[in-house]
Amino acid sequence: MKKIVLAGGCFWGVEEFLSRINGVVSTEVGYANGRTENPTYEDICTKNTYFAEVCLVNYDENIISLKELLAKFWTIIDPTSLNKQGNDVGSQYRTGIYYVEPSDLEEILNSKEELQKSYSKKIVTEVKPLENYYKAEEYHQKYLKKNPNGYCHIKLD
């Protein structure tokens, strides 16, 4: 089992999209790479905590490779948009790939480099080691499964 943490704007839609991928064993939404301890949703929306809304993905690399998972992730974000995805604006909505295993870095950078060839604008999706992670409040977990008509900036159908 491998882990990767992905930020692609509002984490509700990102989690729903990723949870539907064959080989993804589990997902959980949370806050990553910020400046404080134990942030709340209100903190990340109203204070300068610099956390990103993220989805922690556990996947079976015998079913889906990191390269394949990232290829799917790139399709749901605008990697050239800084701190904005859809109607959501703020540093918490930045795009990012946060790796747990340093051995994943080369594959991530290769994926980003390959994608850059199809964009004239610079890709601003950050690639960093996972520095910290806090699970989001329970009402955010599997939000769109619990609230099928809830807000989502990603086209899921």
From Swiss-Prot:
It is an enzyme of class 1 (oxidoreductase). GO terms for cellular component: cytoplasm. Keywords: Oxidoreductase. It catalyses: L-methionyl-[protein] + [thioredoxin]-disulfide + H2O = L-methionyl-(S)-S-oxide-[protein] + [thioredoxin]-dithiol; [thioredoxin]-disulfide + L-methionine + H2O = L-methionine (S)-S-oxide + [thioredoxin]-dithiol. GO terms for molecular function: L-methionine-(S)-S-oxide reductase activity; peptide-methionine (S)-S-oxide reductase activity. The keyword Zinc does not apply. Its EC number is 1.8.4.11. The keyword Lipoprotein does not apply. InterPro entries: Met_Sox_Rdtase_MsrA_dom, Met_Sox_Rdtase_MsrA_sf, MsrA_MetSO_reductase. Pfam families: PMSR. One of its GO terms (biological process) is protein modification process. Belongs to the MsrA Met sulfoxide reductase family. This is Peptide methionine sulfoxide reductase MsrA. It comes from Clostridium perfringens (strain SM101 / Type A). The lineage of its organism: Bacteria, Bacillati, Bacillota, Clostridia, Eubacteriales.
